[in-house]
Design a protein with these regions (language model features):
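Asp-based, Mg2+/Mn2+-dependent phosphohydrolase catalytic module
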Residues: 1-7, 95, 111-112, 116-212
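N-terminal helical cap/lid subdomain that shapes the substrate entry/recognition surface
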Residues: 2-100
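Conserved phosphate-coupling serine/threonine residues in phosphotransfer and NTP-handling enzymes
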Residues: 14, 108-110
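Flexible domain-boundary/linker segments
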Residues: 24, 30, 43, 61, ...
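Secondary-structure boundary/capping positions in well-ordered alpha/beta enzyme cores
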Residues: 36, 62-63, 101, 125, ...
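Non-catalytic, surface-exposed connector residues within folded enzymatic/regulatory domains
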Residues: 38, 46, 67, 84, ...
């Protein structure tokens, strides 16, 4: 078994089941731009894996509309962010990883503001497990570029061999490969049929404990 010192998690689709956000963007877009050409639900699926800036460019949301668009999508709709919940077992696994003496980190394409929003979904005990948080605000290039993992290595002083990155998307897998970090495919959060290159594949969060 490798000598890991830190387990780094992606956020959406790995810690929290936020697939509902696809529907939020779909409905919010229709509400904000009723006169634009219709876009099918499938068009919004890539938004699940992209940053806020990438989504605005992808959906052609002008900069001056961004704040209102996000408010409509994530706060005004009936199924708001309160619908986003941690995956079953993830809270217990995070706490157990810390008890075993490993550091726990975050590598997400969310902004600081958006990431800290998951405090509403995670308990204080779980949120306090994170000793290093990498978000879009601290890097030049987001996943699949390796920047966010390189940032975590820089902040912690840990070499790539001592990090294990857990994620649910091809962007996560490519980020890990580019950084030279072992990757665990969090299959519990996958929303499609695509197969990702990985060192390990885990069907449930609890399986992570057997990799440490």
């Amino acid at each position: 078994m490798r000598n890991y010192k830190m387990v780094v998690f992606d956020c959406d689709g790995t810690l929290v089941d936020s697939a509902i956000m696809i529907a939020m963007l779909y409905e919010g877009y229709r509400k904000m731009y009723p006169n634009r050409s219709f876009l099918p639900y499938e068009h919004f699926i890539p938004c699940y894996f992209q940053s806020d800036q990438e989504n605005c460019a992808y959906l052609q949301i002008p900069k001056e509309d961004k704040e209102r668009f996000e408010d409509i999508c994530f706060h005004q709709l009936e199924f708001g962010m309160s619908s986003v919940k941690p995956f079953s077992g993830i809270n217990e696994v995070l706490i157990e990883i810390r008890k075993l003496g490993y550091e726990v980190g975050i590598a997400t394409s969310r902004s600081y503001e958006a990431f800290y929003g998951i405090r509403e979904q995670l308990s204080k005990e779980v949120f306090d497990c994170f000793s290093c948080i990498g978000v879009q605000d601290v890097v030049h290039y987001m996943k699949p570029a390796p920047d966010v993992l390189l940032y975590i290595m820089e902040q912690t002083g840990l070499p790539k061999e001592q990090l294990l990155f857990v994620g649910d998307s091809m962007n996560d897998a490519r980020c890990a490969k580019a950084a030279g970090v072992d990757f665990v495919w969090a299959k519990w959060g996958s929303i499609g049929t695509e197969v990702f290159p990985c060192m390990y594949a885990a069907e449930k969060p609890e399986e992570l404990l057997f990799l440490l």
